[in-house]
Amino acid sequence: MTDILAKIAAYKREDVAARKAERSQAEIDAAAKAASAPRGFKAALEAHHAPGRLSLIAEIKKASPSKGLIREDFDPPVLAKAYEAGGAACLSVLTDGPSFQGADDYLVTARAAVALPCIRKDFLVDPWQVAESRALGADAILVILAMIDDVLAAELMSEARRLGMDALVEVHDEAEMARAGALGSDLVGINNRDLKSFVVDLAVTERLSAQAPRDALLVTESGIFTHDDVVRMEATGAKAMLVGESLMRHADVTSATRALIA
């Protein structure tokens, strides 16, 4: 685990402990069951994909550790509607506060504004967070193999299935791709960002895609800015892309989304 992930995992465990002290497992399970029915995240990606076209997971992200503040004019419901109008298949909403200036309410309000499935983009270190994610309205969770072991990853994925959610399993290298396959992942994200240097290289997806589980839907993440990038990633066999910063920096998010997908 890199230093940055170790720091995030440490504060996230403290945060989860505090949240669990306020809401028992029974209480969070009840809230999850009371939430509106899950929207099929993976199914939406499959439905939007076509030859020469990657499905888009459009990200609502205010800031990041590497880039700082990304968008000052930040209104999650407005951005969600802009992405939907631009043709996005799904949304990704950052809820981590310390590193990304995210908030749980961003997910709640963004999902309420649209009909798109939403993934909660956060750092999961406890199965309790899966039920919490469903209670917030999330249709999918992110499982980052670089910061957890396979036992916890399997628990998170199992809990997601129990609640009718999809799990996007994120990998960064060959070893993690092998782990994703062993875990039976059917939705795998390849992050093109090096977690130590923060350097982004689309060649990561080109290198790892051939090792992806045969039946998994492959998502390429980070570093996609132009339609040429999309064409390059489509050639790897990826069916979807997760894009945040390049769209969030545009004044006209809808037009930028359409241009990227077209």
UniProtKB/Swiss-Prot annotation:
<dbReference type="GO" id="GO:0004640">
    <property type="term" value="F:phosphoribosylanthranilate isomerase activity"/>
</dbReference>
<dbReference type="InterPro" id="IPR011060">
    <property type="entry name" value="RibuloseP-bd_barrel"/>
</dbReference>
<keyword id="KW-0822">Tryptophan biosynthesis</keyword>
<dbReference type="InterPro" id="IPR045186">
    <property type="entry name" value="Indole-3-glycerol_P_synth"/>
</dbReference>
<dbReference type="Pfam" id="PF00218">
    <property type="entry name" value="IGPS"/>
</dbReference>
<keyword id="KW-0210">Decarboxylase</keyword>
<keyword id="KW-0057">Aromatic amino acid biosynthesis</keyword>
<comment type="similarity">
    <text>Belongs to the TrpC family.</text>
</comment>
<keyword id="KW-0456">Lyase</keyword>
<protein>
    <recommendedName>
        <fullName>Indole-3-glycerol phosphate synthase</fullName>
        <ecNumber>4.1.1.48</ecNumber>
    </recommendedName>
</protein>
<dbReference type="GO" id="GO:0000162">
    <property type="term" value="P:L-tryptophan biosynthetic process"/>
</dbReference>
<dbReference type="InterPro" id="IPR001468">
    <property type="entry name" value="Indole-3-GlycerolPSynthase_CS"/>
</dbReference>
<keyword id="KW-0028">Amino-acid biosynthesis</keyword>
<dbReference type="InterPro" id="IPR013798">
    <property type="entry name" value="Indole-3-glycerol_P_synth_dom"/>
</dbReference>
<dbReference type="InterPro" id="IPR013785">
    <property type="entry name" value="Aldolase_TIM"/>
</dbReference>
<comment type="pathway">
    <text>Amino-acid biosynthesis; L-tryptophan biosynthesis; L-tryptophan from chorismate: step 4/5.</text>
</comment>
<dbReference type="GO" id="GO:0004425">
    <property type="term" value="F:indole-3-glycerol-phosphate synthase activity"/>
</dbReference>
